[in-house]
C-alpha cells in the first residue's frame, strides 16, 4: 500500500504543529462558523489548531473570517475587523485559556504558516 501524498503532508504538518505547542485536531464544524455542511444532517469535519495559555483568563470571542478580516459573531468590539493575513482561515474562537483557528489545512500543505498562525493566536490573546 502506498501512502497518499496529501495524507502524508497533513500528518507531517500536524506533527510539526504539535512540536511547536499548537494543538491540531479535527472537529465537527460549529454552526456559527458557517462552514458548509457535509450533508443535510452532518456537519463537516474541520481542522482546529489551538494554543493553550496556562495563566490566561481570556474573554469569550467568536469570529468568522470574511475578506481577510474578523467578522465578530460574539465578543468584544476590539476584535472587530482585525486583519487576518493567513490563508484558508474560516473562523477563530477564544475562551478561558485557549485561542484557536478553524482552517482549511489544504490551503497550506507545506506548513509554511504555522509559526505565523501561532504568533497571530498569541497576539489576539494579548489584545
Question: Over which residues does each language-model region extend?
Answer:
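Transmembrane-cytosolic junction motif
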Residues: 1-18
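A common structural junction motif
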Residues: 121-126
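Structured extramembrane domains adjacent to transmembrane segments
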Residues: 27-120
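Membrane-cytosol interface motif
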Residues: 14-29
Amino acid at each position: 500500500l502506498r501512502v497518499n501524498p496529501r495524507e502524508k503532508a497533513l500528518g507531517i504538518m500536524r506533527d510539526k504543529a504539535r512540536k511547536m505547542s499548537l494543538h491540531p485536531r479535527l472537529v465537527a464544524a460549529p454552526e456559527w462558523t458557517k462552514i458548509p455542511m457535509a450533508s443535510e444532517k452532518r456537519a463537516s469535519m474541520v481542522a482546529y489548531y489551538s494554543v493553550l495559555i496556562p495563566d490566561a483568563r481570556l474573554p469569550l470571542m467568536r469570529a468568522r473570517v470574511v475578506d481577510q478580516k474578523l467578522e465578530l459573531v460574539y465578543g468584544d468590539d476590539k476584535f472587530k475587523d482585525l486583519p487576518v493575513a493567513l490563508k484558508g482561515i474560516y473562523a477563530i474562537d477564544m475562551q478561558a485559556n485557549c485561542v484557536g483557528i478553524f482552517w482549511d489545512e489544504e490551503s497550506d500543505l507545506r506548513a509554511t504558516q504555522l509559526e505565523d498562525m501561532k504568533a497571530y493566536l498569541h497576539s489576539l490573546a494579548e489584545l
